[in-house]
Amino acid sequence: MTPADLRQSPPLPPGGPTARTVLQLQGVGKRFPGVVALDGIDLDLRAGEVHAVCGENGAGKSTLMKIISGQYRADDGVVLYDGAPVQFSSATDAQAAGIAIIHQELNLVPHLSVAENIYLAREPKRGPFVDYRALNRAAQLCLQRIGLNVSPTTLVGALSIAQQQMVEIAKALSLDARVLIMDEPTSSLTESETVQLFRIIKELRSEGVAILYISHRLDEMAEIVDRVTVLRDGRHIATSDFASTSVNEIVARMVGRPLDDAYPPRRSTPTDQVLLKVRDLQRTGTFGPVSFELRKGEILGFAGLMGAGRTEVARAIFGAERPDAGSILLGDTPVEINSPREAIRHGIAYLSEDRKKDGLALAMPVAANITLANVAAISSRGFLRFADETAIAERYVRELGIRTPTVAQIARNLSGGNQQKIVISKWLYRGSRILFFDEPTRGIDVGAKYAIYGLMDRLAADGVGVGVVLISSELPELLGMTDRIAVFHEGRITAVLETGKTNQEEILHHASGRSHA
């Protein structure tokens, strides 16, 4: 059956227990060198349903969606689309059949307009030229369908992340997608933007679109998900109705054991020794003045709404942005930090919220990434001592539980949780004493989150003089892992709260600026 044949299939009925199966995987397997990514996966997706796929990083979710969307070919098993076996040769082939995917890392061209992105490589033509009037008219219809109030002529680069995601959905609708794969669609959205996305998902479901929904945010699934499938180590563990399955059951299936607590017991206790003092730091139009202290053995949280200035303050202390005024003291010693290189020399590390862009050399091996910030320590006369590099990397792989076949594995091939551990290893090997973790658990699964939390606590508790700043948009994460929480609003700290004596409501009160009303 060709993509053209598939596009001519009849409209799909609304979802439900008797809805027709649109897509079915039978015994699907996929292998890579040294890794079995999928092992005999069975899965069915029905018209008009939202079917969640959950699993730890490395469970096989990404490989699964790439097989369905034509980016990979299965080594074993069969994929059935409308009951007929298919083997898409490319993502374009799958799109032609009505299968669209919205990646977590959006696939848009910033310098092109909204309309040009929606119909990229499919623009209506008038003779040899693009018919921009027809293009913008068609794009406007797609935008109206999802309720996105932007002009089709607006450059995509000028849109917010949430608006760009809506453009991706509009693009999928322009393909007449009957199967829509969504990969971590809410990871970069605010609460109100998530509400808007869920409204669109519900409308698509009512129109008979089959949606495969991949997410780590189990708590938000109840509103939209009909069924949930759990993968672990490339195998199908269970499929069940979401309404009759508790979050704890899903987590237990994901990690292979009951997970009684979301956060490990804290071992670290702050001392009276101040590692970092920030006094009246400011950058005109961005933040400030900001003042706070970080103590040895402490995990200090930065809370606040998007754009409140938390990341900008951390980047200024790390030397990635230049403040206009204020001072930074290590202990009682003033320091001037004009670049990340100087910050690193002073023992300050910053783990970016975008680890793939700023934290890793994705095309390099695990070993090279771990030693990247301290290459001089394993070099002699300008030559790298590869045996030392390997030994050091293997030590951190063991200590941090990094799942990789060897330290020669390319970093790009590892899961998000393991990539995050590599970034942490890099700074530990450098001997950093002040660590800024910026959204460290974004896009990683519940088991990997627990491991990252344990690492942060271990760093603060090990008695080597480390202090940790945790920047997070997840209030339960801040309440579960920190000693104190500095709350930001419009570039200023509006309160510093003792974690054990506060709650989400008080944090939100200060984050919204109501404490200054």
UniProtKB/Swiss-Prot annotation:
What GO CC terms are in its UniProt record? Answer: plasma membrane
Indicate where this protein resides in the cell: Cell inner membrane
Tell me one GO molecular function of this protein: ATP hydrolysis activity
SMART domains per the UniProt record, alphabetical: AAA
Which residues belong to any copy of the ABC transporter domain? Answer: 23-258, 269-515
Annotated positions binding ATP: G55, E56, N57, G58, A59, G60, K61, S62
**Record Gene3D superfamilies:** P-loop containing nucleotide triphosphate hydrolases (3.40.50.300)
Q: Which UniProt keywords apply?
A: ATP-binding, Cell inner membrane, Cell membrane, Membrane, Nucleotide-binding, Repeat, Sugar transport, Translocase, Transport
Q: Which InterPro entries match?
A: AAA+_ATPase, ABC_carbohydrate_import_ATPase, ABC_transporter-like_ATP-bd, ABC_transporter-like_CS, P-loop_NTPase
Keyword Flavoprotein carried by entry: no
Reaction(s) catalysed (UniProt annotation): D-ribose(out) + ATP + H2O = D-ribose(in) + ADP + phosphate + H(+); D-galactose(out) + ATP + H2O = D-galactose(in) + ADP + phosphate + H(+)
> Where does this protein chiefly localize?
membrane
The catalytic activity of this protein is classed by the Enzyme Commission as: 7.5.2.11, 7.5.2.7
In the bilayer, the protein is annotated as: Peripheral membrane protein
Top-tier EC class: translocase
The UniProt function text for this chain reads: Part of an ABC transporter complex involved in carbohydrate import. Could be involved in ribose, galactose and/or methyl galactoside import. Responsible for energy coupling to the transport system.
PANTHER family documented for this protein: CARBOHYDRATE TRANSPORT ATP-BINDING PROTEIN MG119-RELATED, D-ALLOSE IMPORT ATP-BINDING PROTEIN ALSA-RELATED
Assigned protein family:
Belongs to the ABC transporter superfamily. Carbohydrate importer 2 (CUT2) (TC 3.A.1.2) family.
Protein name per Swiss-Prot or TrEMBL: Putative ribose/galactose/methyl galactoside import ATP-binding protein 1
Q: Which organism is the protein's source?
A: Burkholderia ambifaria (strain ATCC BAA-244 / DSM 16087 / CCUG 44356 / LMG 19182 / AMMD) (Burkholderia cepacia (strain AMMD))
